[in-house]
Amino acid sequence: MVILKNVGLVDASGYGGRLVGPPTVIATSGQFTMPASGNLFRIRVQGAGGGSGSARATSATGLSASGGGGGGAYVELWLTRAELQALIDVAGGYLDIIIGAGGVGGTGGAGGTGGTTQFGSLIVCPGGKGSDYGIAASTSTTALASGGASGADPVIAIPGLDSSKIILSMAGAPGHFGISVQSPTLAGHGANSPLGNGGVGSGASATQSDGKGYGSGAGGVSNGLSSVAKNGANGGDGVIIVEVYA
């Protein structure tokens, strides 16, 4: 171990930093128990993305577009084995895991808010907001459709946690505006997240584009002249990823 430390293969605490197996990707709600091995854990928690609002039915001179959905909040941090074990022990031997579902695309209205993802009560990452019902515009006007707001700030409630172990803690990004400029119309792109790309804002002839990966916002939708109403797209689901290091 001394040799490894001298050549820089372990840190001052003696951790080798070797990844033990593939990361554990938790995409469904359940319970988290202490891993059998590992001395250091990187924990990534992603709230779900917001859905996009639907586009309105249009007349021979009407247009409609919605903005993209907002992204979910995100936390990434390190815990030692002793720290994680103590937190699990206090919670009764396991942590309840809640994985937020992506916001549902609007049907005749606004998109849904993404669900909150929780690592017990220790890390809470709210989902992104859905975008509003698509604007009603026309060939003689210019209008903007607001994107979904970002997810609220995450909450880290780990007693005594050294702030240097928090890699990233941030609210999600807002969705992009949709726009209608007299005749052309383009919906807003969904917000990206650290673990996914937002759905693409669609043109009048394109189909819905859901959020990709995890925690990203849905792409907005749009309608050209004389079109039936078009449902919004769905945001990306939340996730928890745990990496175990020797």
Where are these regions (language model features)?
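Beta-rich globular "head" domains
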Residues: 19-57, 158, 162-164, 169-173, ...
